[in-house]
């Protein structure tokens, strides 16, 4: 839908909640206003921005690491050292295993999720306007963490690591006993234990992904509502205070995702 065709606040809000989608059957862009979304579509805007932000993280940290000095650090080096120290302290406090992968993983998760969340602070119409008028894109959403597919995919990656460390530390037999003999240590309760432990295990990635998605989707929606329902001269009254408050939200959600990942992997790494 072109900007000139948007005549009501409802159309404006709906336009900004549509993803740029690729039909995997025809490999053509989907016009969200012509046909409803199906299973065989890929949200390429979410994929694009998540990959780009991941590359920004890698390039930025690599450049700072290559140019780091033992003397008085610059502002960027000092900021990155502060982030690394903060993440490392959390890993030392919460993870009691011996893996050397957890700290880099936690750092990657924290910075990557923060960068994806930070996209919510960009002017709501800036990148969609550029995409529509210069690239001819029918829709564009720029906050990857407001897409449930992205957050659940990240949570699925954490879930795979939970299973990996559980089996690595406890063995197949120990992990099986954990699923079948807890909380009731009697063979007659194996079906009940399996259901309870299975639900508990599956709830970890589901809650991890949906928590991040829900908070970021709500934040994005509030920005869209402010822009769509209020006249331009009064939008600053609400958007600026909400943006300031939203800085806390995007940082907190990145921190929570990181902390829960560390805790889940620490629990999986405990030997029984």
Curated annotation (Swiss-Prot):
It is a multi-pass membrane protein. The gene is atpB. SUPFAM superfamilies: F1F0 ATP synthase subunit A. GO terms for molecular function: proton-transporting ATP synthase activity, rotational mechanism. F-type ATPases have 2 components, CF(1) - the catalytic core - and CF(0) - the membrane proton channel. CF(1) has five subunits: alpha(3), beta(3), gamma(1), delta(1), epsilon(1). CF(0) has three main subunits: a(1), b(2) and c(9-12). The alpha and beta chains form an alternating ring which encloses part of the gamma chain. CF(1) is attached to CF(0) by a central stalk formed by the gamma and epsilon chains, while a peripheral stalk is formed by the delta and b chains. Pfam families: ATP-synt_A. It comes from Erwinia tasmaniensis (strain DSM 17950 / CFBP 7177 / CIP 109463 / NCPPB 4357 / Et1/99). One of its GO terms (biological process) is proton motive force-driven plasma membrane ATP synthesis. Belongs to the ATPase A chain family. One of its GO terms (cellular component) is plasma membrane. This is ATP synthase subunit a.
